[in-house]
Amino acid sequence: MKPHDSLISFNGFTVLLGSKAEQQLIFSEIKEQLLTSERTDVMIVQKNWPFFPYLNLKEQVFLDISEKQKKSKQEDIQSKLMIDSSCLKKAVDELNTFEKIKLQLMHAILAEKTNLIIEDPIDDLSITEIQDLLVHLCDLVNEFSFSILLLTHDLSIAESPYVHFCKEAS
């Protein structure tokens, strides 16, 4: 049994605090666990979102989302996450890290992925974006019953009032 086998089981808004090296190791273990797992309710949110080269951004965001789901929830979710409609018309290389994260969160809501594992995006975000992200993540937990595991090295994030649980990575 690996030391981090329970990492894909978490509740509320949980922060896993550790160095970047520890995060990389844990993130690799989580990916490996998910590949061998039958869980379909988990999504990994990455700052360097891997895109399918043959899809445009809108197709990427709505991949595997039914038309019914898309039509019934898209506008409401875009509004909640403060995603401008012009964002979906951008080229992938025009997106900043915060836009990529918000689009992945929108996909997670539409795809009904209720467990999110988020790779540390903090170094690539402004203070305002970090504050907005924490509010969005807390809203996902409270409004959509999501469970979120955020890997970070930033102690101020771990001590945020939005965070329910904090664990040391080691």
Regions inferred by a protein language model and the residue ranges of each:
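Hydrophobic anchor residue at the start of the ABC signature
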Residues: 105
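Conserved ABC ATPase signature
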Residues: 91-98
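Conserved catalytic loops of ABC-family nucleotide-binding domains
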Residues: 37, 130-158
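Glycine-rich P-loop/Walker A and Walker A-like loops and their local beta1-loop-alpha1 context
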Residues: 2-37
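Catalytic "switch" loops of ABC-type ATPases
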Residues: 41-52, 154
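Walker B catalytic motif
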Residues: 91, 117-126
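Q-loop/switch helix immediately C-terminal to the Walker
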Residues: 47-82, 91
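A short, proline-enriched helix->beta-strand linker immediately N-terminal to the Walker B motif
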Residues: 109-116
